[in-house]
Each structure stands twice: as C-alpha cells, then as structure tokens.
C-alpha cells in the first residue's frame, strides 16, 4: 500500500498563495515609498536611511495599534479596502501627538486561510493610509494560521516609527492655565467604541449591516466603516509655524480619558459641550441605547478626533490656518486650574 505524502498545503498553509499575494501588493507598497527607503519588500527586514543632516538631536518615536472590533463590521459587510486606512491612522495619529513626523510603517495580518485578493484589498487601504500620512510601508508579516481564526476572519496590527527633534518633543509640560483647546472634527466613530456601537445598533436596534440608519441616509456599513481621519499633514503644518503645547488623539476612553494624558499636574480641561456639532450617529446611539452622557464622552470621540492645546494669543491664527487646510475645527474649551484630587475634565 502506497504511503500518503502530506504537504504544508494539506495542513492549511499555502506558500504559493502567499507568494501570489506579495506580487499583488508590490505596486501598492511602491506607491508609499520615500527617498530614504533602501529596499523593496520581500527581505527579512525593511531598510530606511534616516538623513541625519536634517536633524540636530533626532529622537525616534514608535507606536503600535489595531482597529479592534471594527473588523467585525468589515467581515459582515465583506468590505476590506478601507480598514487598512484605520490601521495606519490609529498608529500615526498616536505618534504625531509628540510632534513626530511619521517615517515608516509595518503591518501584521493574521488569518486562518489566506485569500490573496482579499488580503491585497486590505493592503490597498494600508497603502492609502500611508500615502495620506506621508510615511513608507516598508514591510510586514502575513500569518496563515489554520484553526486559529473562525471562517474568513482575520486580525491586524500596525507599527509606525517617526522622528522629532529632541527640543521639539511635545509632552504637555508647557501647558498653562488659559491655553485654548481646539478640536479637529472626526469622520465618525473612527476605530473606537465599536463593541458598544455593535451592541446598540445590531442587537438593540435590530439593524442589519446593509440596513439604513434612521435619519442618516446611510447604511450601517457606510456609516460605521467610514475610515478614521489621518491628521498628520495638518498637524505637521501647524507645528512648523505655531506653538502647540499639547496634543491628544481621542481614541478609546474618549475626551474624558485622553485629554488628561497630556495635562500637567494642577491643570484641568473645561470643555464646552455645545461648542461643536456632534455627528448624528452619536445622538442616534445615545438615544437608542439610553446611554448616559458621561458614558458617551468616555467611550466615543463624539465628533472630535484630535485636540490641540495652544496659547490663547495664537488660537485665532491657528483656526484660520486650519480652515485653509480644509480642517473643520472648533475651539471647544480651555485649560483651567485644578485642585488636587479633582476631576481633570469638566463638561459644561
């Protein structure tokens, strides 16, 4: 009796599919390239030559993140071409809050069975995000792990590295009482709060992924899969000409948890709730889920994706510049004195 020969493909890992995928994404990767990139993808590591002549004391800033359960909605809608934008946004928006220019990005994609076309669609979004952020996609890892994930599901992680002059690191230490808080509009939920959003919209409201959201004129998929905004170019533009004392990326924890991360001791943020237009999706969820206001501001960005802390005397010029950059911005509050043991954010 002839012995059966077992291959890696029989075990669920298709090396040929992986090679096909790499060839499919090469043009997408090339579209993100910068002059400092020294090699194409496919090597064991990405090579990036930092131009030391541009800096006096360069400091590298790194960040890593994922997109959480927003992926579940991508699975339901079978839409995968924008989720990569979210991945890049979550990472680069984190490192620009310290004043760092994003230089390069790497991604990790894990799935039970690799579908080259779907994976290439995902990387299309990653490439688009890198183009928006001005950083190069220099490498990544695609892990095919049979039996580890359910059906066609996958998970993603991203890794960004940027650079900032040591003397220009933004750490919030120069924030003072009287500084103004400027909020940059979000595009929707971005990539946080989706576990609660799914519970309210899919379970409590009983809507399907292709159903219309009442009063929005959009389907659940269209609204909830809107890509996270990437603020890199606007923020870097401001940093060249203005004093920005602090920056907060409004992610998990919302305004209530993220703004305090950049405030020095003795300071609090006073936020005027009626100073910006809260997108309707947040009002729909709050009403349908009977969600308390504090819970909304502690879970979602509520329409503000990035907060700048700036000197009062520069706030007007900064708002004018932001308008010229096509940013929708609002003066949402100010920094005030905070007594020890008190809350760091007041909603008024």
Curated annotation (Swiss-Prot):
Q: Please classify the protein's predominant subcellular localization into one broad category.
A: cytoplasm
Pathway named in the protein's UniProt entry: Purine metabolism; IMP biosynthesis via de novo pathway; 5-amino-1-(5-phospho-D-ribosyl)imidazole from N(2)-formyl-N(1)-(5-phospho-D-ribosyl)glycinamide: step 2/2
This protein's source sits in the domain of life called: Bacteria
Q: Which UniProt keywords apply?
A: ATP-binding, Cytoplasm, Ligase, Nucleotide-binding, Purine biosynthesis
Q: Does the keyword Ligase apply?
A: yes
Q: Which reaction does it catalyse?
A: 2-formamido-N(1)-(5-O-phospho-beta-D-ribosyl)acetamidine + ATP = 5-amino-1-(5-phospho-beta-D-ribosyl)imidazole + ADP + phosphate + H(+)
What Enzyme Commission number(s) appear in the record? 6.3.3.1
Tell me which GO cellular component terms the UniProt record holds.
cytosol
Name the top EC class.
ligase
Task: Name any Gene Ontology BP term.
Answer: 'de novo' IMP biosynthetic process
Pfam families to which the protein is assigned, alphabetical: AIRS, AIRS_C
Which Gene Ontology terms cover its molecular function? ATP binding; phosphoribosylamine-glycine ligase activity; phosphoribosylformylglycinamidine cyclo-ligase activity
List localization entries. Answer: Cytoplasm
**Family per similarity comment:** Belongs to the AIR synthase family.
Q: What is this protein called?
A: Phosphoribosylformylglycinamidine cyclo-ligase
Query: Which species is this UniProt entry from?
Result: Citrifermentans bemidjiense (strain ATCC BAA-1014 / DSM 16622 / JCM 12645 / Bem) (Geobacter bemidjiensis)
Species lineage? Bacteria, Pseudomonadati, Thermodesulfobacteriota, Desulfuromonadia, Geobacterales
What gene is it encoded by?
purM
């Amino acid at each position: 009796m002839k012995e059966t020969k077992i291959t890696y493909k029989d075990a669920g890992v298709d090396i040929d599919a992986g090679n096909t995928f790499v060839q499919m994404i090469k043009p997408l990767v090339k579209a993100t390239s910068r002059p400092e990139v020294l090699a194409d993808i496919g090597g064991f590591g990405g090579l990036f030559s930092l131009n030391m002549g541009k800096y006096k004391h360069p400091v590298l800033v790194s960040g890593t993140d994922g997109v959480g359960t927003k992926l579940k909605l991508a699975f339901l809608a079978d839409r995968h071409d924008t989720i990569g934008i979210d991945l890049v946004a979550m990472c680069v928006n984190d490192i620009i809050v310290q004043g760092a220019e994003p230089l390069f990005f790497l991604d990790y994609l894990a799935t039970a069975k690799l579908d080259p076309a779907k994976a290439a669609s995902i990387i299309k979004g990653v490439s688009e995000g890198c183009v928006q952020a001005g950083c190069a996609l220099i490498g990544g890892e695609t892990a095919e792990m049979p039996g580890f994930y359910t059906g066609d599901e996958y998970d993603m992680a991203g890794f960004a590295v940027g650079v900032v002059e040591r003397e220009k690191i933004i750490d919030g230490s120069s924030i003072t009482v009287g500084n103004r808080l400027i909020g940059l509009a979000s595009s929707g939920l971005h990539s946080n709060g989706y576990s609660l959003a799914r519970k309210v919209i899919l379970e409590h409201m009983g809507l399907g992924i292709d159903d219309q959201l009442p009063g929005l004129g959009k389907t659940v998929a269209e609204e909830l899969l809107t890509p996270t905004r990437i603020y890199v170019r606007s923020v870097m533009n401001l940093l060249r000409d203005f004093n920005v004392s602090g920056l907060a990326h409004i992610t998990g924890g919302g305004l209530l948890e993220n703004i305090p991360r950049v405030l020095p001791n003795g300071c609090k943020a006073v936020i005027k709730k009626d100073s910006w237009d809260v997108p309707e999706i947040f009002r729909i969820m709050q009403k349908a889920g009977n969600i308390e206001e504090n819970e909304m501001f502690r879970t979602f960005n509520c329409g503000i994706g990035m907060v700048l802390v700036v000197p009062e005397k520069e706030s007007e010029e900064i708002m004018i510049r932001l308008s010229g950059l096509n940013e929708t911005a609002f003066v949402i509050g100010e920094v005030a004195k905070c007594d020890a043991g008190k809350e760091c954010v007041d909603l008024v």
